[in-house]
């Protein structure tokens, strides 16, 4: 897909702050530091529209990125970080649950996992949460360039089995460094965002 225009439109913590207009939305979920910002930047050919951070838990709001004036990527707070108070985690959990369970414009979710390691308990819970609410899921296994090519299929199989993925759900190996998986990711996303 040729992205001509991309902008961060709003950062929201509650429904009244979400953008209106009914454009389709794709949520991006994943552990802190799994590479969500790098994924967004690679997908839209920008270096730093989505700010990358080495500090886990940097994204504390739902960030709505309007792409080509036609749909949104919604970057949701990363999970699985230790340095945040239980109260903060609870607040973020409530915010995410409200978004995922009530947002009609939400058409699909991208769950990002780190290809180098088996998915975490939090990854499994997130996948099950999305399936429970019947939100279509595309799993993106990031940092593929950090895994030797000969081991890609083995790591992908471990990810599929750990998440207990449904047969029809795509698992795409992705690298923000090399661009691997970018075309496949767009191919999987377009049916949900083409209006």
From Swiss-Prot:
It holds the Pfam family MMR_HSR1. One of its GO terms (biological process) is division septum assembly. The keyword Magnesium applies. GO terms for molecular function: GTP binding; metal ion binding. Residues 22-195 form the EngB-type G domain. GTP binds at residues 30-37, 57-61, 75-78, 142-145, 174-176. GO terms for cellular component: cytosol. It comes from the Bacteria. Keywords: Cell cycle, Cell division, GTP-binding, Magnesium, Metal-binding, Nucleotide-binding, Septation. Its cofactor is Mg(2+). Mg(2+) binds at residues 37, 59. Necessary for normal cell division and for the maintenance of normal septation. Belongs to the TRAFAC class TrmE-Era-EngA-EngB-Septin-like GTPase superfamily. EngB GTPase family. PANTHER family: ENGB-TYPE G DOMAIN-CONTAINING PROTEIN (PTHR11649:SF13), MSS1/TRME-RELATED GTP-BINDING PROTEIN (PTHR11649). This is Probable GTP-binding protein EngB.
């Amino acid at each position: 897909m040729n992205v001509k225009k991309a902008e961060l439109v709003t950062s929201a913590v509650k429904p009244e702050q979400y953008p209106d207009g009914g454009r389709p939305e794709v949520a991006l979920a994943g552990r802190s530091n799994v590479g969500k910002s790098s994924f967004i930047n690679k997908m839209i050919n920008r270096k730093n529209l989505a700010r990358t951070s080495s500090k886990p838990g940097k994204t504390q709001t739902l960030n709505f990125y309007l792409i080509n004036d036609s749909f949104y990527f919604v970057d949701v707070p990363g999970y699985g970080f230790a340095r945040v108070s239980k109260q903060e985690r609870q607040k973020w959990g409530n915010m995410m649950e409200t978004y995922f369970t009530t947002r009609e414009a939400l058409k699909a979710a991208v769950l990002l996992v780190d290809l180098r390691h088996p998915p975490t308990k939090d990854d499994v819970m997130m996948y099950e949460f999305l399936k429970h609410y019947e939100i279509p899921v595309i799993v993106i296994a990031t940092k593929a360039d950090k895994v030797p090519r000969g081991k890609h299929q083995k790591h992908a199989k471990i990810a599929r089995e750990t998440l207990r993925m449904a047969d029809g759900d795509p698992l795409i190996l992705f690298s923000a460094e090399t661009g691997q998986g970018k075309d496949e990711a767009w191919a999987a996303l377009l049916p949900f965002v083409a209006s």
